[in-house]
Amino acid sequence: MISSWCFWSEPTWAELKRRYDGQVQFQWKIALMDPSGLPTSREQEQWFYRRSGMMMRSAFMLNTDWYDPSLPEWLAPNCVAEAAKDFGFTDDRVRLALARAALREGKNIADWHIVAETGAEAAGIDVDKLLDRAKSPVIEKRIRASTAEFRALQITQRPAFVIDTEIGDRAIFSGVIKLEPLAATLDSMLDDAAAYAAHKAHFGDPPKK
């Protein structure tokens, strides 16, 4: 959730949701970053931010003040974002608020209270209830399970887009954040699914033998 490339992908994600509203079901999941994918220093983090910012032609540079290289993973913001789902907030508002707090404002998102306050304000819910839920074993279990799903895809780059259709087609993008290839793939897969539906309307299910 706090990956810089996930942050840069948000406009694409928002446009895909707008463009395919009513045609595609969208869902986000957490894939925790471990030491193998985390910078070893704040200076290294700044270097990565400069590179991604230049690639995105960004008018601003991401903030590294939040980053603590001694931490092996970032449970607090991810658990709070996941916990907000249990209060009915399955959209992007809490996740985006936490990402902005870290990557734009440099807030200490390793602090459970800071991230809970940020998430609660974004969702308009009680901060103590959100914090209690975020710290519950069930939430950590859920994000570790979704992280295991990510690893099972045998990809390494975030964000990852996994597109499935009812006819069994699947497309996986790892580290791709531009709209055009994702939209082209969705158009192709939706067209194939529509063709299957049209064929079934004319001929029914396949013969059993």
List each language-model region with its residue ranges.
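C-terminal cap of thioredoxin/glutaredoxin-like
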Residues: 2, 10-18, 100-209
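Structural alpha/beta surface segment adjacent to cysteine/selenocysteine redox centers
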Residues: 7-104, 197-205
